[in-house]
């Protein structure tokens, strides 16, 4: 959608009115500085990863490095994905080599049908690698991962199953066919596979999943449930709950932004206006929520009982910023200012680690799952990934605008 003259005029007025604020056009030097710091800090992390031959995930409660799990870990694609973005920015071959090296460690996971996070794992690693290099071996691996992922699709439900419920903590919740809002993020790989292969089967699954999720996951105020459980035979909704939020009816911060990012993706590939409208509604809900602090970095749950004395979630903020940058390119509304404000605050000393600190992760103060007493107020590899992605999106956008002015 082309931006209206009204939006363009509004942005100009906004830039004049806020000329002293961080939400004005981001100087290219500032973006360079932030990306250069990300490269320096992640270089230190890379040294540790190479020495251990493991993929960094987070830091434990007692201050030790926590590597991704053996077997399968939904976060294992983010570190090589960050390396791909840093290769795109620096053109330094060490990042390409690092990304290739670490994604190779989980290549066989593309054939594991027990996990729904194959899109997270493989799109963020091999998908970025294929986008940047065009390596056909990466394309083959992505196709395998996509074929495995769609085996979890139930036509009666119309969705891809999230967790299996025959073991672990998931077996204790009484679920039959749980679908989590996070699963919207796995659709990007499917849409991309239809684009690069010409086979609509991937896109058909993605569209069905997005449509059913749009129908059942969102409350009248556009906030999202975390988990919707379905009857696998009839396709009917059994219950709506949470796993990582404060309560079943609360608004888990990262869940809201998974939905924002997911429907922005859906619009990118389909140009179906209902997805754009949904993304805009979620964005407006997040931006205008009364629980969002002035620095725009949310508490881990908008309804957490001890606000303002609750942990922030920098990962949710980074995901939001990245999604808003893309959404701004499709919408008549101005979402870029909010994205820049979030990134400016994430880049402050309150959230951005000092060089060599924070176990060499970039961002501090993220939350994995408070109900599971896991990864609370720690760095997370996906917070770094989406922060760097957001910076790269802004960097590429600014370069595009500067080139258009020259032409």
Residue spans for each PLM region:
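Glycan-recognition and catalytic cores of secretory/periplasmic carbohydrate-active enzymes
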Residues: 25-407
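Bacterial Sec-dependent N-terminal signal peptides
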Residues: 1-29
């Amino acid at each position: 959608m082309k931006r209206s003259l009204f939006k363009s005029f509004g942005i100009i007025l906004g830039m004049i009115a806020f000329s002293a604020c961080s939400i004005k056009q981001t100087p290219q030097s500032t973006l360079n500085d932030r990306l250069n710091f990300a490269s320096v800090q992640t270089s230190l992390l890379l040294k540790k990863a190479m020495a251990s031959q493991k993929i960094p995930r987070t830091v434990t409660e007692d201050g030790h490095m926590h590597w991704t799990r053996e077997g399968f870990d939904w976060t294992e694609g983010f570190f090589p994905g960050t390396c791909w973005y840093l290769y795109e920015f620096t053109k330094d071959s060490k990042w390409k080599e690092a990304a290739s090296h670490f994604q190779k460690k989980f290549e066989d996971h593309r054939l594991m049908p027990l996990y729904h996070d194959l899109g997270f794992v493989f799109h963020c690693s091999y998908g970025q690698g294929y986008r940047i290099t065009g390596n056909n071996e990466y394309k083959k691996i992505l196709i395998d991962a996509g074929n495995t992922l769609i085996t979890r699709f139930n036509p009666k439900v119309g969705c891809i199953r999230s967790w299996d419920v025959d073991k672990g903590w998931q077996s204790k919740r009484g679920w039959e066919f749980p679908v989590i809002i996070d699963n919207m993020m796995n659709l990007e790989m499917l849409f991309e596979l239809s684009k690069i292969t010409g086979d609509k089967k991937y896109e058909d699954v993605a569209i069905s999943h997005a449509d059913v999720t749009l129908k059942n996951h969102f409350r009248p105020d556009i906030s999202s449930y975390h988990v919707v459980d379905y009857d696998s035979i009839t396709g009917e909704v059994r219950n709506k709950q949470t796993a990582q939020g404060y309560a079943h009816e609360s608004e888990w911060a990262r869940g809201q932004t998974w939905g924002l990012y997911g429907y922005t993706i859906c619009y990118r590939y389909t140009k179906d206006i209902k997805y754009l409208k949904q993304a805009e509604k979620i964005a407006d809900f997040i931006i205008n929520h009364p629980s969002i602090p002035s620095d725009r970095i949310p508490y881990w749950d908008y309804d957490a009982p001890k606000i303002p004395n609750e942990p922030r979630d920098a990962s949710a903020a980074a995901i939001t910023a990245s999604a808003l940058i893309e959404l701004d390119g499709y919408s008549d509304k101005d979402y870029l200012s909010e994205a820049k404000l979030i990134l400016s605050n994430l880049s402050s000393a309150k959230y951005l680690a000092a060089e060599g600190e924070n176990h060499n992760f970039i961002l501090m103060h993220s939350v994995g799952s408070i109900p599971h007493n896991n990864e609370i107020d720690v760095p997370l590899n996906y917070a770094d990934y989406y922060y760097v992605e957001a910076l790269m999106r802004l960097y590429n956008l600014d370069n595009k605008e500067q080139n258009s002015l020259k032409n």
